[in-house]
Structures are given as C-alpha cells and as structure tokens.
C-alpha cells in the first residue's frame, strides 16, 4: 500500500473515531444521575460527562486542577439544628460556601438564610420542591421550579438569588442543562461527596474522614449536607486538615470565572 493511501486510511479511521467519541460524550448526558469514579488518592475523579461537554451548558463539577482550591457546597431540604454550628465553623475558618436550598427550607428558616447571605455565602437554587427535573415535560415546568424559589428567596432577603443551580439528587438531562443555561443559570455538580444524608444511619467521624481526606483534590467541588450531625461534628477538624494539606477555600462564583 502506498504511503498516500496509508495516510488516507488513517485519516478516515481518525474521523470515524472522532465521530463516535462526540456521539458518546453527547449522548452520555441525555439523562443521567450524577456519579463519580475515583482512580487514586488526592486525584480528581471522572464524572459521567466530561468537563468540556458540560462547559457548553455553563455547567461544571470541577475547578482548576492545577490549584489547591476547594469549593464548599451544602445541600439542604430541611433544618435539624446543624446549620448554625456549621456556619460558626465556616466563619472561624473564613471559608465561603454555597448553600443549595429548596422551598421548604427557605420558608421555615428565614433567619438562617439571611445569615448565610450576611456572612458572604451564596444561596443557590435547589428547586422549589426537590423534584426529579429530568422527568418534567417542558421548559415552562422546569423554569417554574426555579423561578418560584427565586421569588420566595426575594421575599425573604430582598435580594435576587444567585444564578447557580444544583439538580435534586444529581438527576438531570441534556434538556435540563440547556434550559438552565437559557434561564441564565450555571449548573453545579460536584467532584467529592459521601453518604452523609441519611439521618437514621449517620457515618462515624472515622468513616467520614476516610472518604473526605484521601479523596480531596485540586479544584474539588465538595458536596455535603448541612442536615448531617456528623458533618457538624467534624467540620472544624475537617477544614483544619484540608488547610494543613495546603488547600484554600473559594466561592463557586470563582469556579466559572
């Protein structure tokens, strides 16, 4: 086979491979539940959609992996007495965070929400009813879940809600990502979390540290639940240990700059 023919053949193979890869990365986020695959300690995990594809929709799960930065985020659908302690510890460490809240939380905990805002944290949109957003059949239904929460937040704080959205339970579709972008939102996933949400079966501090210390990594977007008794108990030591590893904390608005 002549050299010219070999190059033509290789070019065709490359083109087909590229087409298959693009099709895979696009289809991989048609509908999905967010999950992570960790390869080695203190290294960023692999998500179900790659960062470049997510960036097309103003979405991200990971920051700059060349910088020792952590983005703290908390999800909450209700309050059980842990958030005030967590806020105290964040203030002690001068650590900004984002709190993704649902309607029920904002309605019943106006003072805590206002404290989050007053102390420089971001309050993000976790939808009005914590519904499966991928199951909604229209952009209008999707938008209503976000705008209803925006209106509630405005009535409590007198401010506009920051345009950061986290899908309930990490379940999403490509349509959801597109709708969020069209509504001016950034979709925020995560690159580190652990099973801290079950109040009937809280992990021990030792279990929590065994997940959160070896898996921390540059540019980590950390998801924790501020309903967790364990998180409230370990937060001071956790932030101290991460700081001793050379990490600093930044707000998620820096994630998209």
Residue ranges and their predicted role:
Residues 1-73, 79-92, 207, 238-241, ...:
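N-terminal pre-catalytic segment of deacetylase/amide-hydrolase enzymes
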Residues 68-70, 80-82, 91-206, 210-223, ...:
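Metal-dependent polysaccharide deacetylase catalytic core of the NodB/CE4 family, i.e.
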Residues 85-86, 177-179, 235-236:
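Short amphipathic alpha-helical segments
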